[in-house]
């Protein structure tokens, strides 16, 4: 991921689907790929195997896949950050509580970590894309909460 992105940046290539400004900064695709890879590697499994081993990794990744486009579209269509946050929270809770029901994600973790996915959408910085912060914020949260789960 890092090598390919480095080559792309060095050559100033903009891949189909990327924004023009990504020709000289790390792309959202690279940030998302890197953060999801890290989440898959270090998300606690709580001793589970198979699909149930994704009790934290799945909602973190689904959160990125669902909440990011929901909030992005709401912001684009309504230009209302408050509405985007409220609908993002709703979508995030649907994801996290769905994983509580289907995968056994601890309810306490679902309630606490769902807002962190939404908070990850809010920072506007050129240093790191929201595709990464939407994964890293709940991932850091689950790592810090793990002793109490």
Where are these regions (language model features)?
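Interhelical loop and helix-boundary elements at the membrane-water interface
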Residues: 1-149
């Amino acid at each position: 991921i890092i090598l390919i992105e480095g080559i792309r940046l060095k050559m100033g290539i903009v891949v189909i689907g990327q924004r023009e400004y990504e020709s000289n900064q790390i792309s959202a695709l690279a940030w998302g790929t890197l953060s999801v890879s890290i989440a898959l590697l270090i998300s606690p499994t709580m001793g589970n195997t198979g699909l149930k081993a994704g009790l934290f990794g799945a909602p973190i990744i689904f959160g990125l896949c669902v909440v990011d486009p929901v909030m992005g579209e709401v912001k684009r269509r309504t230009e209302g950050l408050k509405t985007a946050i409220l609908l993002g929270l709703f979508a995030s809770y649907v994801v996290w509580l769905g994983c509580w029901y289907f995968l056994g994600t601890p309810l306490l973790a679902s309630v606490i970590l769902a807002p962190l996915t939404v908070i990850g959408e809010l920072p506007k910085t050129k240093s790191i894309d929201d595709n990464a912060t939407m994964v890293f914020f709940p991932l850091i949260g689950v790592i810090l909460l793990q002793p109490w789960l």
